[in-house]
């Protein structure tokens, strides 16, 4: 599996990329200079793929990923799926897409996005890997992993992930 090791610099870069995409909680604060152009937006497919390839990320970044998936449901999914398979992160991606679908179902006007995400989720089910993983939290102590095996949300168990992030709590 081609995952990226822990790196505070990588986490900061992903947080900055989330800000450039307009993600709530990550948007850059204005400096008060009207002539300053906004930072260039990143490709959401690249940001998502890079984040999912990290073995350890702050929970705030992981919780922002469903927003990226829902907000940019028209992203280049062929690239994302290819990268997920190459890096072995298809289960992580599947769980994030599931969370995005539940997030999108909370408000009106997302029908087209939800249809697209359901198609992506179906493709991810076809390439799901039968192994245990974490949701970008590889450094969890074994005692916490044991607890998560017994207490994770059903969606996390479906995707073989050890996480307590509940799709119903993501907003």
Residue ranges of predicted features:
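Mid-protein regulatory/catalytic core that forms ligand/cofactor-binding pockets
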Residues: 27-125
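Charge-dense, extended regions
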Residues: 110-171
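Long, low-complexity intrinsically disordered regions in eukaryotic proteins
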Residues: 9-26
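Homeobox/homeodomain signature
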Residues: 8-11, 149-151
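Basic, Lys/Arg-rich alpha-helical nucleic-acid-recognition elements, primarily the DNA-binding modules
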Residues: 1-6
């Amino acid at each position: 599996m081609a995952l990226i090791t822990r790196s505070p610099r990588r986490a900061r870069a992903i947080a900055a990329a989330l800000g450039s995409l307009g993600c709530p909680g990550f948007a850059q604060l204005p400096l008060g200079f009207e002539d300053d152009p906004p930072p260039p937006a990143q490709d959401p497919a690249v940001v998502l793929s890079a984040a999912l390839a990290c073995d350890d990320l702050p929970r705030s970044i992981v919780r922002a990923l469903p927003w990226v998936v829902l907000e940019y449901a028209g992203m280049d999914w062929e690239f994302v799926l290819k990268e997920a398979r190459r890096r072995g992160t298809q289960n992580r991606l599947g769980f994030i897409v599931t969370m995005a679908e539940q997030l999108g179902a909370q408000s009106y006007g997302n029908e087209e996005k939800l249809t697209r995400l359901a198609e992506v989720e179906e493709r991810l089910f076809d390439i799901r890997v039968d192994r245990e993983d974490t949701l970008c939290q590889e450094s969890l102590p074994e005692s916490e992993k044991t607890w998560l095996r017994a207490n994770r949300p059903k969606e996390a168990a479906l995707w073989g992930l050890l996480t307590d992030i509940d799709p119903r709590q993501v907003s």
